[in-house]
Amino acid sequence: MNLYRIILVDDEEEVRKGIIRKIDWEALGFQVVGDAENGQDALEKIEQLEPDVVMTDIRMPYMDGLTLTSWIRQKYPSVKVLIF
């Protein structure tokens, strides 16, 4: 079974790690391939890891989730974005 590759983006490490730990990603068809603490960090990870999905917080320092989403849609239109 091919798993969708997902990256989690949130400026609060406890939130990121908690989401990664508490959800059975594989049972839902996902593989967490990375995480990032802000939109700028996420840009590099997205280019390196080529995820299918990015799950991002909306409010973060340096680059917020809306700006990140806009960038993803322009550069990687096939990547789905979930904003929380």
Predicted regions located by residue number:
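Non-catalytic signal-transmission and effector/linker regions of two-component phosphorelay proteins
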Residues: 1-5
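Active-site residues of response regulator receiver
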Residues: 10, 57
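Two-component/phosphorelay signaling modules centered on CheY-like receiver
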Residues: 13-34
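Conserved phosphotransfer cores of two-component systems
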Residues: 27, 47-49, 71-79
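Acidic catalytic/metal-coordinating carboxylates
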Residues: 38-41, 64-67
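Active-site beta3 strand of CheY-like receiver
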Residues: 49-55
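Receiver (REC) domain active-site loop signature in two-component systems and cognate sites
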Residues: 60
